[in-house]
């Protein structure tokens, strides 16, 4: 197992939110091919099946949805921490 890239994790979260590679690509300002590639690399790096592919349709498995939710929460926590140190409140040293 390799630690996944943040770009791949963001692609997963966006895909989970929108349900399509096309909408995830629009949100991330990437091509559909780039998002699909990130999702494939994420599965490879984790050695974990999280996507079901039927023809051209791609859907998250139940475990994939659970992982995407965990990743979303982790990215929000990282973003919140970055905001807190960048814009500290008085007395919150």
Annotated model-derived regions:
Residues 43-60:
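A short LG(V/I)-centered, amphipathic sequence patch enriched
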Residues 79-83:
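A short, exposed helix-loop element centered on a Lys and neighboring polar residues
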Residues 1-18, 36, 65-68, 72:
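Short alpha-helical elements of helix-turn-helix
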Residues 31, 38-41:
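Residues within the DNA-recognition helix of helix-turn-helix
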Residues 20-21, 39, 53:
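Helix-turn-helix DNA-binding elements, focusing on the entry/boundary residues of the two helices
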């Amino acid at each position: 197992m390799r630690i996944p890239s943040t770009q791949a994790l963001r692609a997963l979260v966006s895909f989970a939110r929108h349900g399509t590679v096309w909408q995830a690509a629009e949100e991330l300002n990437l091509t559909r091919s780039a998002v699909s590639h990130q999702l494939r690399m994420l599965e490879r790096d984790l050695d974990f099946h999280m996507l079901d592919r039927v023809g051209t349709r791609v859907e998250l498995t139940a475990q994939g949805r659970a992982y995407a939710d965990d990743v979303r929460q982790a990215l929000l926590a990282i973003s919140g921490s970055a905001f807190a140190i960048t814009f500290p409140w008085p007395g919150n040293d």
